[in-house]
């Protein structure tokens, strides 16, 4: 399956999540393979789209927030594009033999990443949720932007 826009050609690799109000797809942009995998969060309901749209438009100007790659409307839905990192969840990383110093280093890296990205408060809340902090063996930290279903 493919999703094409004027400047992008997303090859869908898999569906990560599906719900009544949103779907999450993992994809790769065939026009820009150097960017790696991305995550498409698809908002399905008009009320959610209207709530997120002004917020997302403001993020276009937040240059340090480079995990946010953009958004586009299609077939009455809003597609939000984020970088995708295929790393292990923090819980799994900490279940390995990690000492106190290494855990402190990981905690510091989480804070550094939050500050570096200039994440808006809403995204901070989401990325600090269970399963959304991803850690590499070298203690590099990335975030997954799978939202909770909005109320």
Question: In which residue ranges do the predicted regions lie?
Answer:
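Activation segment of protein kinase catalytic domains, centered on the conserved DFG
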Residues: 93-109
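Structural motif in protein kinase domains
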Residues: 84-94
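Short beta-strand micro-motifs within the conserved protein kinase catalytic domain, predominantly
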Residues: 67-78
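Protein kinase-like catalytic core scaffold
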Residues: 64, 80, 141-144
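Short, well-ordered beta-strand micro-motif
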Residues: 26, 81-83
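Feature marks short, surface-exposed loop/turn motifs that line or immediately flank catalytic pockets
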Residues: 75, 88-89, 150
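Catalytic-loop of the protein kinase fold
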Residues: 70, 105-107, 114-149
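ATP-binding glycine-rich loop module of kinase domains
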Residues: 2-63
């Amino acid at each position: 399956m493919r999703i094409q826009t004027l400047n992008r050609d997303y090859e869908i690799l898999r569906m990560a999540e599906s719900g009544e109000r949103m779907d999450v797809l993992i994809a790769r942009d065939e026009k820009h393979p150097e960017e790696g995998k991305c995550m498409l969060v698809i908002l399905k309901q008009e009320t959610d789209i209207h709530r997120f749209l002004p917020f997302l438009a403001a993020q276009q100007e937040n240059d340090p927030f480079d995990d946010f790659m953009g958004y586009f409307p299609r077939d009455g839905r809003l597609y939000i594009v984020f970088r995708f990192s295929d790393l292990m969840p923090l819980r799994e990383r900490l279940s390995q033999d990690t000492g106190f110093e290494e855990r402190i280093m990981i905690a510091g890296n989480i804070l550094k990443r939050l500050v570096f990205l200039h994440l808006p408060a809403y995204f901070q809340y989401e990325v600090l949720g269970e399963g959304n902090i991803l850690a590499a063996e070298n203690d590099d930290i990335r975030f997954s932007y799978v939202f909770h279903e909005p109320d």
